[in-house]
Each structure stands twice: as C-alpha cells, then as structure tokens.
Amino acid sequence: MKKLLMLTTGGTIASVEGENGLAPGVKADELLSYVSKLDNDYTMETQSLMNIDSTNMQPEYWVEIAEAVKENYDAYDGFVITHGTDTMAYTSAALSYMLQHAKKPIVITGSQIPITFQKTDAKKNITDAIRFACEGVGGVYVVFDGRVIQGTRAIKLRTKSYDAFESINYPYIAFINEDGIEYNKQVTEPENDTFTVDTSLCTDVCLLKLHPGLKPEMFDALKSMYKGIVIESYGSGGVPFEGRDILSKVNELIESGIVVVITTQCLEEGEDMSIYEVGRRVNQDLIIRSRNMNTEAIVPKLMWALGQSSDLPVVKRIMETPIADDVVL
C-alpha cells in the first residue's frame, strides 16, 4: 500500500469568497475531504505548510516546501503538493533543483476554480495527482488537466481555461484519463544517482524584459541590488548595441561581477546567439546562455546556482549543465 503525504500551500484550489475577493481559506484536511477515495491502494495524510495566494509566493517558501519533503521523505512513498497556479511553474522548477534525483514522485497541482465551487477542476486535478503519485515515478512533476509535465518545463499560458499549463520545448511525460495513465515519454533515472537536497538559494536575482525604448541607464541601478540578472531579449537572443546601447551596459554589469543570463521572449525553440550580429557581439565566454530553458526555470536555477557559488565559471557551468531535463543541448 502506498503511503502519500499531501502538502498544502493555498492557492485558488483552497480559496473561498471574501470581502475583497477570492482568498485561500480551505484547510488541508478539508481540501482532501472534497475528493472521493480512488481505487488505488494508498493512504494519504495531510500537512498544511502555508495558506497563501501564490502571487505572494517567495523563494523562502520554496525552501520551506523542500525542507518538508526532506523531513518526510523516508516516511512516505510519494508527495502531492497543492499550489496556486500563478507561480506554480517557478515552484516546480525550484523544487527540481533543490530536490535532485528523487526516487519518489513529488507532484504539484492546483486548479483554476476553487474546490468549494460546484463547477471546478480541482477535484480532477487532485485525483490525477494522487493517481500519478501512486505510480512511483521519481522526480518533480506538475499534474494539471490530465497532463503530466516535467517540473522544469511547465509554463502557465492561460489565465482562465482548465488547460492552463503546457510543456514547453519538452514532451509531456504522460496523459491521465478515465482509462488510466498513458505515458508519452519514458522516465529514466540513473540508479547510481542518489537523492540530494540542497536548499541554498541566493535570492538577489532580477528578471528584466527588453523592449524598444528601454533606457540603458536603468542597468546602473541594478548593480548594487542584484548578483544575477536574467535578460529576456528578442528572438534568438540578441542585445541592442545601436541607439539605446544596452550591450555596453550588459558588459559593465559583467565587469562589476554580476552574473548575466540571456534568454528569449519567445516561448518555443530557445535562444541561439550564434546566428545574428546582435547575438555574436555578446561575449560568449562571460555571458550565460539559456538555450531552450524556460524563464520560469532560469530564475530559480540562477538563485540555486548562486547559492552554490559566486564564482562566474562555476555558476556558468551549473547554469549550462542540464538538470532535471531543464535544457536539451
């Protein structure tokens, strides 16, 4: 019999109507009471970690979630984490870096409609998450609307539809329906890799989206505030060097010891800075390339990498090395 633990953090799935709109209010045991027992041979216990709207999610809370999994890892066969949808992709990626080579399923889910509403996707999503947790497939995953997504590859694309999340630049792991679980990709974990937990994070990371007209001077203000900056550039990853010269400011950031990651605003296919002059002018030895990683994975990965070291070559190596299938080289 599988022994599962549900860790709750709040989110839409646990929300109720209040004077100022929807806000988390359903407790862990109550949340589970809305879901009918499955035929799967399992028992489930609950633990409430927090009860927040995921818009208020912070890196320190990622650590709390990871530590809860660590503390209970030996006592349970799998974990279901309920979470708000707005920052779920960031959390799933962060857990993928802090909880590497898990031999047990760590499944994150939530809903677009509160579980207390008559018409809701919450019951199905929790049910699907439990079913997948019973499979015993190790790793961190997002389960939503019948789709199983690698924890580092989930992105929220829709604000209202049930199919809020998609897997970007990576196949779906599986699909869940009434007939069972249909695997779309074989999940393999090297047997010699042991489960490791490292919750060291440096939260001094900024995400900046380029746009025409952006003032280069704003980069000066970032020097004293951050140790790492993720720049969402255009297309294949070029950086403007004419008119409002952003490239010079990027070079100044690097010279001052700040780690800079270049990614693209395009969701699919990733950056390739080797194609255009605007990409080739960037110093490939000093800049960190994101290739086809999702922004929602790049940000927590950079926090985690800077938590391991402040040395640029070390951080660059970590960032450009695949972890939990976050990048395909």
Curated annotation (Swiss-Prot):
Pfam families linked: Asparaginase, Asparaginase_C
Recount the UniProt induction comment for this entry. Expression is induced by asparagine.
* Record-linked SUPFAM superfamilies: Glutaminase/Asparaginase
UniProt keywords (A-Z) are:
Cytoplasm, Hydrolase
Answer yes or no on keyword Cytoplasm.
yes
Catalytic residues identified in the record: 12 (o-isoaspartyl threonine intermediate)
Q: Which residues form a coiled coil?
A: none
Classification via PANTHER family = 60 KDA LYSOPHOSPHOLIPASE (PTHR11707:SF28), L-ASPARAGINASE (PTHR11707)
Sequence similarity: Belongs to the asparaginase 1 family.
Any idea what this protein is called? L-asparaginase 1
